[in-house]
Amino acid sequence: METSNFYNEILTEHNIRPYHKHDMPDATFSLNGVNPSCGDDITLKLKVVDDVIEDASFIGDGCAISQASADIMADMVIGRSKEEALRLAEMFIRMIKGSVTNEEIDELEEAGALKDISHMPARVKCAVLGWHTLQEIFEKNEDANT
Amino acid sequence: METSNFYNEILTEHNIRPYHKHDMPDATFSLNGVNPSCGDDITLKLKVVDDVIEDASFIGDGCAISQASADIMADMVIGRSKEEALRLAEMFIRMIKGSVTNEEIDELEEAGALKDISHMPARVKCAVLGWHTLQEIFEKNEDANT
Amino acid sequence: MSINVNISHREDFPLLRDSNIVYLDNAATSQKPDCVIEAVEEFYHKHNANPLRGFYELAMLATEQLENSRTTVKEFINAKFEEEVIFTKGTTESINLIANSYGMNFLGEGDEILISIMEHHCNILPWQFVASKTGAVLKYLECDMDGLISDTAIEEAITDKTKIVAITQLSNVLGRENPIARITKTAHEHGAIVVMDAAQSVVHVKIDVQALDVDFMAFSGHKIMSPMGIGILYGKKELLNKMPPFLRGGEMIESVTRTDAVFAQLPYKFEAGTDNASGAVGLMAAINYINSIGMEYMHERTLMLTKMCFDAICKIPHIHIIGAKDSNNHNGIISFTIDNVHPHDVSQILSESNVCVRAGHHCAQPLCDFLGFKSCTRASFMFYNTQEDIDTFIKSLSGIRKMMGYGD
Amino acid sequence: MSINVNISHREDFPLLRDSNIVYLDNAATSQKPDCVIEAVEEFYHKHNANPLRGFYELAMLATEQLENSRTTVKEFINAKFEEEVIFTKGTTESINLIANSYGMNFLGEGDEILISIMEHHCNILPWQFVASKTGAVLKYLECDMDGLISDTAIEEAITDKTKIVAITQLSNVLGRENPIARITKTAHEHGAIVVMDAAQSVVHVKIDVQALDVDFMAFSGHKIMSPMGIGILYGKKELLNKMPPFLRGGEMIESVTRTDAVFAQLPYKFEAGTDNASGAVGLMAAINYINSIGMEYMHERTLMLTKMCFDAICKIPHIHIIGAKDSNNHNGIISFTIDNVHPHDVSQILSESNVCVRAGHHCAQPLCDFLGFKSCTRASFMFYNTQEDIDTFIKSLSGIRKMMGYGD
Ligand SMILES: Cc1ncc(COP(=O)(O)O)c(C=O)c1O
Ligand SMILES: Cc1ncc(COP(=O)(O)O)c(C=O)c1O
């Protein structure tokens, strides 16, 4: 586990200069996700039109991993359909559990920068917080939205 | 600790053929003493006239040590004054705790056969049950009797 | 399975290896093999940190050890989920947890708690307490003089009023295995839950909580060759989920304010305070050791030793074995009385020949009362005992009445 | 006392001796010296039996070891009587015992429980529970931003309604020693009892329960170099005598019938189940080790290390130490925040240099809220830490903001 490699530029950049950390007045979904034991706390906001994520943002605070991971996620899901976003979420969570192929890591783009979390059980929750919240938004609203 | 020496003739004799294990209809004092954790259970009976123990007996059951010790005690205190009996009780209990002189052990006569109990913490309660009950009888009745 | 009585496992146990002790008090606590003692040592040499708390490597190693142990226990008892396995300090704490968290909160006036007459005090007193506080009624399920709990007794004792049946899988006095699956079935038909005390059985019977369908199960590590101070509570997830915590403190919370707290998920909700990780590691090593020797083999060997001893005792006059007439129903436990010799004297005389047995009421006074004696002597075996152990024991036992001054 | 910083005690601790770990999470748990690990091993090699139960020699040895440990603890904390020393599995169990046995039975509607704002969750949640069940009111005694509890605060908070004051002798976040004797005096004037959490203090402050006049006191062995799974509850005899038992089972009874039980004398009334004798033996070895090193020397050394580290941190920009400005008020505990870097990231980055520190709310969320942060990083020292440890820590700490992408 090489931490200095781990806190790489992708991660630190998304942490200190997040693109998508802001409010979204016209969001169609908003959900709070927390890791109570860590104190990580984000509110994910999505603007979904016809099952396509037109915009994504988050507010909140927490460790660099939770914040950067949420920011990277927002970046990735904007413009994607609900199904594609959920497929990425599933893939990301699998990566964190240590069972993805190299092709899949490539597909995860910048989120692949978090793959070493699979060796850091204590940080798993931080990395997946954003993605879990995304999944929850769509699960909770499945009925309403179909 | 040589147990075979310990269960000597004095002890086994007093255990299986106790002289004083019987009821006493004209007892002036009767008190039940128990070691709940061991199950030792005796009722000590004394006939005290003018502060002199005219007769002593016990009923009940328990291990050889508790029974033999009670029987030996009864033997020793018959004919003695309350004060002398209490002095012997104090001496006996000290012997069990391992702090008596050889002269004192001699004075304890047959009760001296129990001196090795001082090396058997688990059996101390058994050996002193009779003597404790004797002390209790006189303590409880101090006011009534003076 | 064919057991060679001449093969000895004594060598694995330093206390036995380095002494001439004839240890026949295995039902009180077991001896520990080198591998268990060394596992604890290794934990302190290499992995010691407060588990579940840190982000540094050592703390993660400690956490991993603790959770590996949980997984090992889960497989050992065939639980469905890891989070159904809760670390406690022993059977006594586990049962008190159930009584305080489940009993106190889900019982009321007129409900019935059924326990067997052969329970250990730790499966009696917590229920007396619950009964006194909730107004529930404590009832007893009785056995016959052979220690058998009959189907009829079960059918009669369990009614729609019964809410909890708490019973040992194996009596620490009688050694007989109780018909748990039978009891669970009847209890569930009447809507009652079953708490199984596995303190004695865990080392003799392969436990399968799913097959037995028990709702709660408890055992202590120290009786299965693991260190002292660690034990297990198993509970079905849906029950544990609806129960409030028992001990309260660190690790079992999600968040705390001045006035309130949100509790953590299972299993942590029930593991307040620093977990005994070294104990858990020792327990894991003990289970691995058991698996390497083979549970079935261990049990067969114990039964063989039990039979040898049982048959020999039967030949000594004035000795009366308590419970079943068939040694196969004794599972390593032989309790007995000797005419006119008190068990404490028996135990002390045996101790002279380095034979360690237990004497007394064995924390089962209601059973002693029921069977009509105050106390008894108990010899209990594990697979690491030897034929020599039994020979020494029998020889010393045979001379006791004479030593106590009796003619025969 | 003059302390030579170059003398190292690291050699006594196998985990430190055989690695390059910089262990600064001592407030979570301590490392164990060889003598403690070996004492546990020796117990299993030579004395292992179920204590308090047997009449054979091995059982008496086990009992003797357990009781010797009790005597050692009695002297260590200067209790008046052996039977005031009760073995538990740790601070958390000890405090839960007090809350459940004393709190639940001697408090009622309108009574007040006073705890400090800096309590560990295990000295908060049990009282929240007691308050919710008995109708008592839970109040908080506050400190200032330096962690000081003033005389005025004490005088105002303790009233005739106060029945229990539960307070830590040393905060696990602030490291500051609280004025316990002062609190006890006021509490007693108002007829309240005092429960002291000594989990953190026991390794830094020479505890004298009689001089402090506390009514109850609790600590865990694992924080003072003894094995996990053992802890102490001290209570004044007259209070313990009038309290009902907490855990119920074997060993804590005199006699049991189907419907009732007579409880044993102190200390056994509160020690249901098989005692963790090997844990007690380890605790005894740890106390003997402490006595051989010298409590005062240990503390002086810790203060010196604390000061070195404190002064160095003060020179790093963007780092804020929590609590007192004087390092002598930190007793081996330095908690801090770094601007814009989350403590979990701090801890993980330090871990890269083998530095073990803890990050989070440290089981003291109400204190964090009160002081205005969600979490912080904590470095905590024991006498076996070295100047090198601190150098490595400071070096790594200095580079964190840069590593996280900040310009300075
Ligand atoms: C002040 C304080 N109290 C109580 C505890 C709890 O101790 P344990 O987890 O050993 O029960 C701790 C340590 O975690 C502590 O620092
Ligand atoms: C059947 C049974 N249940 C419970 C216990 C209690 O176990 P522990 O003392 O380890 O809590 C014992 C052993 O003493 C036992 O034999």
Please report, for each region that a protein language model flagged, where it lies by residue:
Chain A
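Alpha-helical macromolecular-interaction surfaces
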Residues: 67-68, 87
